[in-house]
Structures are given as C-alpha cells and as structure tokens.
C-alpha cells in the first residue's frame, strides 16, 4: 500500500517537473518568435525606407537636371557678341558663367519708347531668343517730354542708378531739346548728364546712340554729328543707326515718322530695332 502511494507521489512530481519544462519551452518559443518577427518587420521597414530614399534621390536628380537645362538656355555666344565693346563682352561672359543677368538699361525720351511695338521691346525679345531667357535683363526708362537739361535738374542719373545697370544705352533727347530750346546746348548738357550718370552708376558701361532722323531739318543733323564726335572723342561706344534710315532730306522718310519733326512710326521702330538687334546679336 505504501509502495503504491510512493509511486503516485513520484509520478506527480515527474508530471509537475515536465509541465514546468514545457512552460519554459513555450515561453522561449514565444520570445524567440517575437524577436524573429520584430527583426523581419525591421528589415521590411528598412527596405521601404531605402526605396523611398531612392525615389527621392531620383526626383532630386531630375530637378537638378531640369535646372541645368534651364541654365543651359542662357549662354554666352562669343559670335553673337562680337560687335559689343570688350568691356560689355566680359560682363556678358561673366554673367553667363555665374548664371546671373546683365542689367541693360535703355534711357531716352519718346524715341526710346517703352511701348510694346517700339524698338526697345523688339530688341528685348530678340536678345532673349538669341542668348536665352534670363541672360539680359532689360529695363526701359522713358522720360517723356524731358529735355537733356531736365534730366540733369530732375536727377534722373540717381533714378537710373537704382536699377543697378551693368550697361546703359543712352539716347540723349535731342528731338525734345529741339522742340523746347533748340539743340545749341544739347551736346554740352549731354556731357554733364553722362558725367553724373558715371558717378551715380559706378561700373556701368555707358553707350550712346542718336535719336531718329527727322524730315528736312538743318541744324538738328549738325547737333547729331556733334554728339557722335563727343562720344568718339571721349571713348563712349556710339551705336549709329542713322545709316539704315531713308534719306531724311526727302519725303521718303515720312512713313517712318509719326510727324515731320517727330518720333518713329511703327516702320521707324522696325528699322531701328533691326539695327540695334544686329549690333547686339552679330550675324
């Protein structure tokens, strides 16, 4: 009887020990499985992150490529710039290398109109077509009805300097001068204004061009010739578009003018635009 009881107790302890061992194995299995799953999830998450990053890198690369294409649209073509003064060529070349714009400021009276169909607007469009968008930044400062003396009195040099010009293409308002006081002092006043402009807009290259021809004038052409001499003697580039106009002593000039002693008509702006375009964009 005692022997059977001992056997039962032994079996009980054996089963208890076995159940403890099974429990330990179960816990170990659960922990191991959880660790394995966590690792698998972590690996999967890591791969997803890499894929996302790769896509992002491709997108950035595409953006950079697009930026290069945009930059490539604006470039310095030495063949186009061969007519320009060396100083201006260097400015254009450096601007292209630095991916910046050359600030060209066109100054004048109604002859250098800021209107859409005027020569200045046509030149702006042609510069963009040839050199690409962004290399030339063109601003037109049209001082309607202001004589050369009034440009000085109104301190227009300081206003122009605010545009931070690299190049200034100045058309002294000789037609306006003629209508107000005559052209007797036009060249002397031009000299004063150009000197003021040189001081206010330090570093800018100043180029001079005449107003358009007018019909049947006597003294006005002499003043224009004196302007050309002033520019040449003082080493200012003179953009002489007069050679492309019809003979102003004949009525053949009239279709190119708004009135006999006036500013350019649409046809006048077209031939003026063609000349300055050929100057800035050599063929």
Segments (PLM) and residue ranges:
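Conserved SGNH/GDSL esterase-like catalytic core that processes O-acyl groups on lipids
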Residues: 95-182
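Sec-exported extracytoplasmic/periplasmic mature domains
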Residues: 128-132, 165, 173, 195-202, ...
